[in-house]
């Protein structure tokens, strides 16, 4: 159930995508404790020491978030980390910027809360509200989750049904705002005009300075792929710099050299070395173009366009409000 609520609460974050709060300024917000967008709505004051349950720890314009509300969000995030990685995870520091996992979790929760508050404020401007049945559904889910929380946790973490219901309602409203924006978006991709292939990729980034070095490295990897008894996937797992290995790539991809090479591959065929603006690729085809793959590729394109569109829309919303975050909150963990 703890992971169930988190899945509900991160829905908006997934819609907004990898940009966090909708702009690079959000990361700066977390580090500098304050964003000033030069907007008309200045951020309210927040408490920077001796936090109590009713202390304001986040301000998005005049809208504030209490320490109690923040702790409710954080409770579910913390439990998800621990259910997967164990309680010792909080002791470790990441290599990047020497942040602890606890600090990363705090920043993740802060971004999520700021997103929801920004979208909620824009919903008020646009007069978008939850219908009665939508509010009842959010409250029912909040009650279901609340009843599943151990009494000890409710007491020690100060979790209240009223606060949890508010969180669920605001997240549902944020999802509704996303759906409203997507309803305005016109995307026209006819599946039968698309060509795509499912491939395994090896990718290494390159720039003007290291281009030749990376090219030579990838040439050696290509030789390894063609001569090794190991599968392409096994080699890719150890050599790629991409986040994943398997991708669906088609003729609408902005990486035109890669797209052209991929859609021309036969099943189980490996490409030559492919140069793109961002680096070098080697592709291995595991499924050639078909009606089902065209539809999958279309859905992928639509999802990408939706995310891109909402990121831009959210950026215009977030620019309307100053944001402040409690220094005491950021200093925790």
Locate the predicted segments by residue:
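Short acidic alpha-helix initiation/capping motifs at coil-to-helix transition points
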Residues: 50, 112-116
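Peptidyl-prolyl cis-trans isomerase
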Residues: 220-258, 287, 291-293
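Short, low-structural-confidence N-terminal segments
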Residues: 1-103, 312-333
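PPIase-associated folding chaperone regions across multiple families
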Residues: 23-53, 136, 150-216, 220, ...
